[in-house]
């Protein structure tokens, strides 16, 4: 069991904010950016970058474009009722990078998340193009803070008929939806982990962001097992629809009650599992709901000391099909 003084915790935060966050992803065909915050009235903005690592500049005679060219479709998903989405296609040539300010790129979505999917530039088909990487910078002007978070990449797995740009079709059933079922694309993880958090206080605060692709009609449960410095375990439950960014104290008071000396900053961690997702219209239940997550932590007395990243993960979520399509797909079957 180890503890940090308040001064030591501040130094740890300073180092964490200065270093690049670890990247456990590899070039993929789908990128998911967990936070889009373009509330300009509150001094918030998000810078989104997408990079095409394909280097093939040989001209494709079918498209008259370099073979490594890809169309990427940005799907901005509104994180509040009615949880609608809008899409914007962009073209990336080999070794190209596109960086946009989300609020200018799509002013219709102030708060939510973003999915970027590789497509053939001539017919909009979903393609196996595992060359995309990306990240985002969430800017808090009022708090003088920025947070850099890598996009979470999902590789295309299906290798269907060759498309005009030379890439293989990723959409096996041709429904225009990216299905994270271990056949078309990689599955979502089974478990998430918050590897560490400081006890919440006047000087430390953090939040978690969760993303689910089940659509606006599902209330998604999240099950927490929280551990303190003494390895004591606390279980808590939380619910959201589609997307949420919630303070740790909005989940449970355990996050500010880890015990120990008042002169020492206590540290804990937690295991996070998607629980039951209930359709609020039909009552249908999806067990072990697939979710993604990201974290942000701040040291409040020090401007600029904010650091975040994707939650650690393990396993594969194996929830399968529903009467209206796959459990885990985008666009979701419950949205238009």
Question: Which functions belong to the PLM regions below?
Answer:
Residues 1-21:
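Sec-dependent, cleavable N-terminal signal peptides
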């Amino acid at each position: 069991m180890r503890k940090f003084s308040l001064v030591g915790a501040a130094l740890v935060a300073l180092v964490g904010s200065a270093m690049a966050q670890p990247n456990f992803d590899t070039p993929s065909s789908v990128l998911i950016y967990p936070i889009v915050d373009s509330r300009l009235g509150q001094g918030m903005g998000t810078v989104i970058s997408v990079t095409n690592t394909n280097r093939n500049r040989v001209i494709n005679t079918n498209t008259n474009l370099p073979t490594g060219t890809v169309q990427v479709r940005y799907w901005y998903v509104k994180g509040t009722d009615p949880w609608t989405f809008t899409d914007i296609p962009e073209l990336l040539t080999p070794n190209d990078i596109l960086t946009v300010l989300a609020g200018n790129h799509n002013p219709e979505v102030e708060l939510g998340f973003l999915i970027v999917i590789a497509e053939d530039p001539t017919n909009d088909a979903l393609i196996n193009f595992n060359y995309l990487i990306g990240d985002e910078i969430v800017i808090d002007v009022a708090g003088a803070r920025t947070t850099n978070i890598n996009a979470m990449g999902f590789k295309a797995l299906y290798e269907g008929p060759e498309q005009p740009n030379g890439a293989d079709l990723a959409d096996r059933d041709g429904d225009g939806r990216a299905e994270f079922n271990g056949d078309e694309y990689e599955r979502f993880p089974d478990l998430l982990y918050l590897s560490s958090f400081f006890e919440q206080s006047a000087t430390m605060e953090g939040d978690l962001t969760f993303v689910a692709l089940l659509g606006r009609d599902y209330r998604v449960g999240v099950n927490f097992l929280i551990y303190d410095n003494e390895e004591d375990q606390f279980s808590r439950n939380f619910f959201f629809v589609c997307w949420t960014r919630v303070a740790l104290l909005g989940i449970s008071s355990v996050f500010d009650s880890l015990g120990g000396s008042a002169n020492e900053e206590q540290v804990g961690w937690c295991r996070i599992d998607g629980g039951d997702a209930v359709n609020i219209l039909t009552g249908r239940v999806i067990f072990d709901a697939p979710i993604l997550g990201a974290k942000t932590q701040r040291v409040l007395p020090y401007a600029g000391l904010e650091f975040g990243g994707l939650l650690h993960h393990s396993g594969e979520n194996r929830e399968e099909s529903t009467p209206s399509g796959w459990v885990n797909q985008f666009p979701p079957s419950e949205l238009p």
